Amino acid sequence: KSIQGLSASPGDLSALHGKEAEMHVLQMIQDGQIHALINQKDGMVRFLEDPEQYK
């Protein structure tokens, strides 16, 4: 990826990085790569056990 227009403030960049990280985690959950819940209120990810191991 290339970074263009670095005129954003550090706070803006942190928010973008957090949102990008959230999207990556969400995609991994949807793809079944990890089992987790995202609490958007506090920005935390709770990892769950793989339900397949109990079948």
From Swiss-Prot:
Lineage of producing organism: Eukaryota, Viridiplantae, Streptophyta, Embryophyta, Tracheophyta
Gene Ontology cellular component terms for the protein in this record: COP9 signalosome; cytoplasm
Recorded superkingdom: Eukaryota
Compartmental location: Cytoplasm; Nucleus
SUPFAM superfamilies assigned: Winged helix' DNA-binding domain (SSF46785)
GO biological process: red, far-red light phototransduction; ubiquitin-dependent protein catabolic process
Recorded family membership: Belongs to the CSN3 family.
Subunit structure: Component of the CSN complex, probably composed of CSN1, CSN2, CSN3, CSN4, CSN5 (CSN5A or CSN5B), CSN6 (CSN6A or CSN6B), CSN7 and CSN8.
Domain PCI, chain residue ranges per copy: 1-52
Record keywords, A-Z: Cytoplasm, Developmental protein, Nucleus, Phytochrome signaling pathway, Signalosome
Predominant location: cytoplasm
Species for this entry: Brassica oleracea (Wild cabbage)
InterPro entries, alphabetized: CSN3 (IPR050756), PCI_dom (IPR000717), WH-like_DNA-bd_sf (IPR036388), WH_DNA-bd_sf (IPR036390)
Function: Component of the COP9 signalosome complex (CSN), a complex involved in various cellular and developmental processes such as photomorphogenesis and auxin and jasmonate responses. The CSN complex is an essential regulator of the ubiquitin (Ubl) conjugation pathway by mediating the deneddylation of the cullin subunits of SCF-type E3 ligase complexes, leading to decrease the Ubl ligase activity of SCF. It is involved in repression of photomorphogenesis in darkness by regulating the activity of COP1-containing Ubl ligase complexes.
Protein name: COP9 signalosome complex subunit 3
Encoding gene, per UniProt annotation: CSN3
